[in-house]
């Protein structure tokens, strides 16, 4: 004996099934949002962390680069080198954890702007700036410590 599925035998259930499928498709951006923001945090954090490791590996050369090559305006080269290295090593860890994501992304965005406008204009910096701006606006996403803390505090 052949039986038909309810979606095929009853037109109203077919419509409900189609509406259900459309509703699930509508939530797809929300479903993909959490992994997207996690990947964005991991990737941009890695970019800056590797840069910080490079700076700390030979800090004397880093200071010379800040004094002669980068010529950062306003700040003394030693302070600029130290603070850039510290931000490049601390902020990525915060981004990876999703802890204080917005605050961690701000110094990295400022550094990106300084690099872009004072030293080396490069298209890649625009991509970094877009991701960091998104993290500042959106936050770390559902897969972040910020989200877990917010859930606990009901913020």
Spell out what each predicted region is.
Residues 1-60, 74-90, 96-155:
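Extended, low-polarity transmembrane helix blocks
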Residues 63-75:
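Perimembrane loop-to-helix junctions flanking transmembrane segments
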């Amino acid at each position: 004996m052949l039986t038909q599925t309810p979606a095929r035998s009853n037109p109203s259930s077919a419509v409900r099934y189609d509406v259900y499928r459309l509703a699930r498709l509508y939530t797809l951006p929300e479903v993909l949002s959490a992994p997207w923001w996690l990947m964005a945090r991991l990737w941009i954090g890695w970019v800056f962390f590797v840069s910080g490791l490079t700076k700390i590996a030979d800090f004397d050369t880093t200071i010379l680069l800040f004094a002669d090559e980068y010529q950062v305006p306003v700040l003394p080269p030693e302070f600029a080198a130290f603070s850039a290295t510290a931000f490049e090593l601390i902020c990525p860890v915060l981004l990876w954890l999703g802890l204080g994501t917005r605050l961690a992304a701000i110094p990295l965005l400022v550094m990106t702007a300084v690099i872009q406008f004072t030293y080396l204009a490069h298209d890649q910096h625009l991509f970094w700036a877009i991701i960091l701006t998104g993290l500042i606006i959106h936050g770390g996403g559902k897969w972040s410590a910020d989200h877990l803390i917010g859930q606990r505090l009901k913020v």
